[in-house]
Amino acid sequence: MDDKTKNDQQESNEDKDELELFTRNTSKKRRQRKRSKATHFSNQNKDDTSQQADFDEEIYLINKDFKKEESNDKNNDSASSHANDNNIDDSTDSNIENEDYRYNQEIDDQNESNVISVDNEQPQSAPKEQNSDSIDEETVTKKERKSKVTQLKPLTLEEKRKLRRKRQKRIQYSVITILVLLIAVILIYMFSPLSKIAHVNINGNNHVSTSKINKVLGVKNDSRMYTFSKKNAINDLEENPLIKSVEIHKQLPNTLNVDITENEIIALVKYKGKYLPLLENGKLLKGSNDVKINDAPVMDGFKGTKEDDMIKALSEMTPEVRRYIAEVTYAPSKNKQSRIELFTTDGLQVIGDISTISKKMKYYPQMSQSLSRDSSGKLKTRGYIDLSVGASFIPYRGNTSSQSESDKNVTKSSQEENQAKEELQSVLNKINKQSSKNN
């Protein structure tokens, strides 16, 4: 029995030794790991080191509890070896206490080494701190800027709606104020003397008098700009056959500009024993005593289509050319049904054709200036200009039907007359060439 108990005791001791070795090895490895981690985080603050120590203590307490549980299990298995187990427990307790003592010493040594290392590192890091201060300030400013940016929170839907409403209200208020101001300005203008028509400028009237136009316009002292009807005034003025078109412009604050385009008076036609003005549109002005009639030619002998063609030819001439014409007579021949005779204001007779007379008469001012005249202004060579075919000067010879009463007593021309004839013919030839080139 003693041998068995000894063997059992030895086996139990061996098991205990193995467990102690296992626990020591595992605790050693764990301590090494924790030490390596502690050295890695040695640059951290003291709070980290205290947390590390607390963590190691927790591991140690776990191992201690584990060993106690194993010892309790073994006590339950063998009731006979109760005394031996108590001895073992005492030994294990002593071993655990020894391990606690060793562990506490190791932790104290580690803390001392960390303190020494920190003390040794502080003088080395001192010069770095001076350089790092500026860097820290820059990082702080950057962080502050970022924080300011990040502090801007996104707007919610309600806030966006409020902003939209505010903007809409501002726009509405501005529009309303502008409208109110405009209405106020308009009302002030309407009821002030500025809106009364003070000036009427009439332009383009040659045959119709200004007083007659003002009478038709009906502008009074109390007439206002906004009540004056341009449409009615234009219709009333265009009822006059002399007026071709009218344009009226209102110029603020109180001026009317009236631009008139008239129908030209191209001729005077005999009607019921009187000579009445004939307009370019073919209308006769009846009862026009107040019309200003300038030097208009007298038309005689025209009827039907020939009259219309002659009216068209005269309307195509410029007013300057028409002033040279004193009379136009329809004088057809057997071969030329469109033959006409023109008597000019400077004493010349011109024969031409209705279809071409308007184009050829535009050169008449040059013809008249090239003629040779005496001191009294009369022509040295009496004759007529034929524009029916080309342009030629034909002097009067003897008594012909085409000669006037003053020309019947004309005899042979002198040398001066022949020279004047040659000069006039040369001018007519030049004009004839120019007209052929233009055509």
Curated annotation (Swiss-Prot):
It holds the Pfam family FtsQ_DivIB_C. Residues 11-20, 87-96 have a biased composition (Acidic residues). It is found in: Cell membrane. Residues 77-86 have a biased composition (Low complexity). GO terms for cellular component: cell division site; plasma membrane. It is a single-pass type II membrane protein. InterPro entries: Cell_div_FtsQ/DivIB_C, DivIB, FtsQ_DivIB, POTRA, POTRA_FtsQ_type. Its main location: membrane. The chain crosses the membrane at residues 174-194. Residues 1-96, 119-149, 396-439 are annotated as: Disordered. Residues 119-133, 426-439 have a biased composition (Polar residues). The keyword Disulfide bond does not apply. The keyword Chaperone does not apply. Residues 64-76, 405-424 have a biased composition (Basic and acidic residues). Keywords: Cell cycle, Cell division, Cell membrane, Membrane, Transmembrane, Transmembrane helix. Residues 1-173 are cytoplasmic. GO terms for biological process: FtsZ-dependent cytokinesis. Residues 195-263 form the POTRA domain. Residues 26-38 have a biased composition (Basic residues). It comes from the Bacteria. Belongs to the FtsQ/DivIB family. DivIB subfamily. Cell division protein that may be involved in stabilizing or promoting the assembly of the division complex. This is Cell division protein DivIB. It comes from Staphylococcus aureus (strain NCTC 8325 / PS 47).
